[in-house]
Curated annotation (Swiss-Prot):
Record bears the keyword Cell inner membrane: yes
GO terms for cellular component: plasma membrane
Mitochondrion among keywords: no
Residue intervals of the FMN hydroxy acid dehydrogenase domain: 1-380
Entry keyword set: Cell inner membrane, Cell membrane, Flavoprotein, FMN, Membrane, Oxidoreductase
Cofactor(s) annotated in UniProt: FMN
Gene Ontology molecular function: FMN binding; L-lactate dehydrogenase activity
Record protein name field: L-lactate dehydrogenase
Gene behind this protein: lldD
Active-site residues per Swiss-Prot or TrEMBL entry: 275
Single Gene Ontology BP annotation: lactate metabolic process
Amino acid sequence: MIISAASDYRAAAQRILPPFLFHYMDGGAYSEYTLRRNVEDLSEVALRQRILKNMSDLSLETTLFNEKLSMPVALAPVGLCGMYARRGEVQAAKAADAHGIPFTLSTVSVCPIEEVAPAIKRPMWFQLYVLRDRGFMRNALERAKAAGCSTLVFTVDMPTPGARYRDAHSGMSGPNAAMRRYLQAVTHPQWAWDVGLNGRPHDLGNISAYLGKPTGLEDYIGWLGNNFDPSISWKDLEWIRDFWDGPMVIKGILDPEDARDAVRFGADGIVVSNHGGRQLDGVLSSARALPAIADAVKGDIAILADSGIRNGLDVVRMIALGADTVLLGRAFLYALATAGQAGVANLLNLIEKEMKVAMTLTGAKSINEITQDSLVQGLGKELPAALAPMAKGNAA
């Protein structure tokens, strides 16, 4: 299959992966309305073309948390990467490291912190949930510190798991799930050989290290699901802020008031995110939520954004809407599943090239020059009637 654009990786991944894995990464919550709007809303943001601007000295470089980035992109924390490619977290981290951008290791990675961190030169970021088992949280933070992780990404939009109906149909969950997954695996030989046989162990590496025993998909659904904490409040984050002396980013912000709370709390950054449409269906897309949040806290805190970003044009759009940096999730996972480290490396090259074209034709020589002036119009005039009341409720 010819890969000429980032979108080609999705089709390739669907062919290679057993359905339970493809649909787990591809799907969203409930009817997947927000999942669709994330992509569609962002694609509708019109860039303002400018000409004859002498763009010969264009630069994508930026700085975030005193780290130099080759472009305003980081790889998002995505669980179970090691089920999509052989030791997938290591391969993705190496690709990000080679490109000069951060890699974020998920709490529920297959490869543990101690396997990924030594494989790269750049300090990686680490993502953590608020869980009932505070002992696990402290253990994970201590290990992340010891491994030299530079930034903590704290995910707060999962006090309870979202309902992902696709998983029951695909075999990730539901009746006879284990047998269905086995039958799917044996009918996808490329994945079965590369990951199923040669990618072992398929533990939840960070959790296994804490529990002192092997773990697997059932623990992902069981132990982790039972440990999400619906009683979470800002107060529960205070001990973590005291313990972690590096940059701390709050992931899962969709409302300007929550963004202001993050500033008051003392966070170093926020991620405008709806968890890729995987938590609460019907909330605003990140693209629609971002401008009001940027109006509220731009300059007071670093603003990152994810959900719906599929190519370099989308990166430029998110920056113009108010983000300082974006996180890639599904986009890099499709590439990882298709061709491992080489696939992610090629994806990042494609995104960089697309960004350069977009910046050249909008007259932005640097990331700081990508502003609302780079857009034809704001999102407000484009809101469907059904979303207008929601947008009003989210206005600063």
